[in-house]
């Protein structure tokens, strides 16, 4: 019986819009080319694949080396369709998590390239991903924050923060905060009215906005003249009210900002207002000493050490039945490294409260 050999059917070509991964060194160049495709379906599918690939450091390096960041910049700033812009912005956020890809973002001037989209794109998701990408970039090596400042973000963010949608206001403020470690960024934010913007947003109905505004205000008050400006704008009263905020993040931020502004003599004097406050600020500070949050108790100890310089405040702290026992409890913590740091600041606070002229 003759042997019958059946021909093996050829494998069908995959659809043009289906993204098939390459291997080794071809992975990055192939995907980068597909991300730049003119066909919308191919481009969107490639961007989706890129967002997944960026979680792998090796694949992220390959894509960055293939020049994908420049393509993403172009899509975010000039993409005609919303899915392309959203996915490209999301991919930039993934790039910012990787050291080599983040370096490529700085080299490609990403902050300047996407500024218009970051602040003004009609799609909220585009703005959200752009904020997240730049916050990560600004939180890394100094080159990242410097590139954001050089692109003019401090002034633009001060102007944008109050106008931004409430859901994105915390991101706008956090991005502004990331610029404040740069001397030029701090100066530009102050010149643009950053103090007034932060004080205004401390009154927001959203806890996340209040917390972000407090963090930003604390960063702005690194500058001595900014402390004076904040004090003159009634920052002490506003921040004292927030010490009893139901949100932990807002209490943390308010306490940190108060530590900054009460380093000045006028800030200390404002702790004793001419007219009594609706709620006693010193009592609120003492209550923070008993919080279970180590960051908050450490900051509260710093605040006690600052304000205890004022004789009236020092007397009130000393006479309060809960103040010194709360400080002693922090000094005698369980003994972890974190507790040791809290105890160190608690000892300083206790010395300030018990100081006699």
Walk through the language-model features, giving the residues of each.
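N-terminal "cap/leader" segments of large eukaryotic alpha-helical scaffolds
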Residues: 2-59, 93, 354-356
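Short helix-loop boundary/capping segments at the starts of domains
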Residues: 37, 52-62, 69, 74-81, ...
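Recurring C-terminal helix/loop segment of individual leucine-rich repeat
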Residues: 61, 103, 143-146, 184-187, ...
